[in-house]
Amino acid sequence: MADIYRFPKFSYEDNGTVEPLPLRTGPDKKAIPHIRIVKVGDPPKHGVRYLDLLLLGFFETPKQTASLGSVSDLTEHTGYSICGSGSLPIGVAKYHGSDQELLKACTDLRITVRRTVRAGEMIVYMVDSIGAPLLPWSGRLRQGMIFNANKVALAPQCLPVDKDIRFRVVFVNGTSLGAITIAKIPKTLADLALPNSISVNLLVTLKTGISTEQKGVLPVLDDQGEKKLNFMVHLGLIRRKVGKIYSVEYCKSKIERMRLIFSLGLIGGISFHVQVTGTLSKTFMGQLAWKRAVCFPLMDVNPHMNLVIWAASVEITDVDAVFQPAIPRDFRYYPNVVAKNIGRIRKL
């Protein structure tokens, strides 16, 4: 059983909504490219800004054509068939041009894709034809990039391994960053276990503009019967001296003094941002890696939900602080379904 504190609506009403990508098609029945930019923090209205970019589009393979052996076959355009949808995160850079120039440069990219495997399935991206607006990101684009397949492809099993695959960019998600950075809580701090402590987790409830059931993301019904999605992130631990009694009121007072502000961004798809505008204890500040603004990309928190809703409208409807006893340090974490060193199973 856990105790819950609900944050007031003003803590997320200013930047807690993301508008949908307009899915329109042209005369050729292809999707019309579009760029969507949201602001997190207080970025400058004009001039140089820091932009985080996520390219969205389709994986395509050449269409199969009958081999007739005629001369016209050498010049005939075969076309492409869509075999899946996905994304390419290219990170943060300084940018001073217009949004439309950036969109044009992104859709002009020639991106080849390969499906492979390491410890898990991966997608390899190789990029060519990098235009001038994308030069701030060129260092990363020219090197080639590898991502966890389940984070960047909606259905990686649909990507063939025996055919050439290209990634055609159609949409661009951009997050314009101000004072709020995209600092993440290091995994070692997020997994920290302290005796005699209370874990402060955030339960974030979302409303989306699409139906998610058919894609494997089941909503929950709220008290009014509306369908909502939710996810949880870990903020930190509250620790008291030995012998001191924890109370819900004590935990609530600690959270209220932080004066947290929440917002949504487009980093990795959909991202949840937390900014501390009030007072913060040294213990809690250390757990946040001495940052007063942190980012939780849904791509890392709940990859499948992120894949389903990253082009839809998304709105924060509630944020709750959930106070739970910290997981004891002697509890063992099992990241793999195969247990080590049991019976005939041995670690290599």
Swiss-Prot record:
GO cellular component annotations of the record: host cell cytoplasm; host cell plasma membrane; membrane; virion component
Gene3D superfamilies in the cross-refs: Viral matrix protein, C-terminal domain (2.70.20.60), Viral matrix protein, N-terminal domain (2.70.20.50)
Post-translational modification: A large portion is phosphorylated in the cytoplasm, but not in virion. However, this phosphorylation is not essential for virus replication.
Topology class, membrane: Peripheral membrane protein
Family matches, as Pfam families: Matrix_Paramyxo_C (PF23765), Matrix_Paramyxo_N (PF00661)
GO biological process, one term: viral budding from plasma membrane
Keywords from the named record: Host cell membrane, Host cytoplasm, Host membrane, Host-virus interaction, Membrane, Phosphoprotein, Viral budding, Viral budding via the host ESCRT complexes, Viral matrix protein, Viral release from host cell, Virion
UniProt comment concerning the protein's domains: Late-budding domains (L domains) are short sequence motifs essential for viral particle budding. They recruit proteins of the host ESCRT machinery (Endosomal Sorting Complex Required for Transport) or ESCRT-associated proteins. The matrix protein contains one L domain: a YLDL motif.
Quaternary assembly: Homomultimer. Binds to the cytoplasmic regions of F and HN proteins. Interacts with nucleocapsid. Interacts with human alpha-tubulin and beta-tubulin. Interacts with host ANP32B.
Biological role: Plays a crucial role in virion assembly and budding. Forms a shell at the inner face of the plasma membrane and concentrates the HN and F glycoproteins. Acts as a negative regulator for transcription and replication by sticking to the nucleocapsid. This effect might be regulated by the cytoplasmic interaction with tubulin that dissociates the M protein from the nucleocapsid.
Protein name: Matrix protein
Species this protein is from: Sendai virus (strain Ohita) (SeV)
